[in-house]
């Protein structure tokens, strides 16, 4: 998503061989991007920052090689703006013509280019505009004004069974069950189905936070997000979390439902529609459902390589895993809504932050003076 249009754009094809390397020096990076001028760049890079730098370096277009083996091209997003752009962000809505190609096609082009210079022609049709979309939210009141926000995105690529139709169905069942038991709720439960997750860079949840900020800031005690649930081959679970509840909270639940206790958690990312940092929601959790290391089929964030492709179909659903994911998330949100005090463990949280800060500081060059940082933290 997000590309300039191109109508038979012609140019010399240039292979970005340094995209296979890591830890490039500043001089290597400088020479690398200078080589892109007036070229159609074939690369393994796919991030928006890279495409932006390629555009600033004078590249004509970018062709991203999908790293996944097989007949896959994962729909992705090179936009750098979170949500609907403001006027001062308009400059970042200018893009190069950019498209993805299959791994086999990319490797074939690399092989041909080794024999000599090649020209390429690129045609891309793209419509970029602000659209009106609908978002459904169910507000099930509890005995207090505080509530747990539970969410998932309903926009999908193609059929999108595991991303994110299964989660949407689970949320619908939550709404049915919780509404039937609404008289028993200590805190309310608000269930939201976001639009604009992929194509709008979390524009739905961003709009919701902007439009409901005061309520979220005052009353929302937790945000639990469901994404990629019920996916075949996703036998293990790791918690993505902001960490305020302490690792044992999610580890206990994960061990109960999988038999394996994780010894780490993954810091929260924006991909879980985490548009609520500024509203200071105390607890933020999205469980991550993964294959066992020996059964991993790809680097995709799901059970297999079908993520964001037309192959994310009903046969990728595992009903047993779906029920596991529905139960663990329901137990978590029910525990939070019914707790006398929300399960925030500040001593453990600060201990974890201390360890992460020390690890970061220990990796810095000795020329970087950390005295003031350490004094402030201590």
Model-found features: residue ranges?
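Extracellular/luminal Protease-associated
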Residues: 1-97, 262
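His/Asp/Glu-rich mid-to-C-terminal helical/loop segments that flank catalytic regions of hydrolases
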Residues: 187-190, 293-354
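Metal-dependent peptidase/peptidase-like ectodomains
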Residues: 106, 143-145, 195-306, 376-378
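Acidic, Ser/Thr-rich low-complexity intrinsically disordered segments
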Residues: 344-378
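Structural recognition of the beta-strand scaffold that forms the well-ordered cores
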Residues: 13-16, 40-43, 61-65, 97-101, ...
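Short helix-loop-beta-strand segments that form the rim/entrance of peptidase-like active sites
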Residues: 177-202, 226
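Soluble metallo-hydrolase cores and metallopeptidase-like ectodomains found primarily
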Residues: 1-27, 85-162, 172-186
């Amino acid at each position: 998503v997000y590309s300039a249009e191109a109508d038979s754009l012609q140019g010399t094809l240039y292979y970005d061989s340094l995209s296979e390397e890591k830890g490039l020096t500043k001089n290597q990076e400088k020479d690398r991007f200078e080589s892109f001028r007036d070229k159609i760049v074939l690369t393994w890079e796919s991030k928006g920052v890279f495409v932006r730098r390629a555009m600033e370096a004078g590249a004509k277009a970018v062709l991203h090689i999908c790293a996944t083996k097989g007949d896959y091209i994962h729909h992705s997003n090179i936009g750098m703006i979170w949500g609907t752009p403001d006027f001062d962000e308009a400059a970042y809505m200018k893009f190069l013509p950019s498209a993805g190609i299959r791994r086999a096609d990319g490797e074939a082009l690399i092989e041909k280019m080794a024999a000599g210079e090649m020209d390429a022609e690129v045609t891309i049709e793209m419509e970029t505009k602000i659209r009106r979309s609908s978002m459904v939210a169910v507000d099930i009141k509890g005995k207090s004004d505080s509530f747990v926000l539970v969410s998932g995105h309903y926009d999908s690529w193609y059929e999108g069974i595991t991303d994110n139709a299964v989660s949407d169905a689970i949320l619908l069942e939550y709404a049915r069950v919780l509404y039937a038991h609404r008289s028993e709720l200590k805190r309310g439960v608000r269930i939201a189905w976001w639009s604009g997750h992929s194509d709008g860079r979390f524009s739905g949840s961003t709009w919701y936070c902007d439009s409901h900020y005061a309520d979220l800031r005052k009353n929302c005690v937790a945000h639990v997000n469901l994404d990629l649930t019920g996916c075949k081959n996703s036998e293990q679970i790791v918690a993505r979390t902001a960490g305020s509840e302490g690792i044992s909270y999610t580890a206990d639940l994960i061990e109960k439902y999988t038999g394996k206790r994780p010894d780490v958690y993954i810091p929260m990312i924006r991909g879980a529609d985490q548009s609520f940092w500024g509203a200071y929601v105390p607890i933020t959790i999205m469980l991550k459902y993964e294959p066992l290391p020996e059964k991993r089929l790809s680097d995709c964030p799901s059970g297999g390589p079908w993520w964001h492709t037309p192959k994310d179909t009903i046969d990728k659903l595992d009903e047993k895993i779906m029920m596991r994911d529905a139960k663990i998330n329901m137990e978590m949100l029910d525990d939070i809504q019914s707790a006398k005090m929300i399960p925030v463990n500040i001593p453990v949280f600060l201990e974890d932050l201390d360890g992460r800060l020390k690890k970061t500081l220990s990796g810095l060059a000795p020329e970087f003076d950390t005295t003031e940082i350490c004094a402030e933290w201590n």
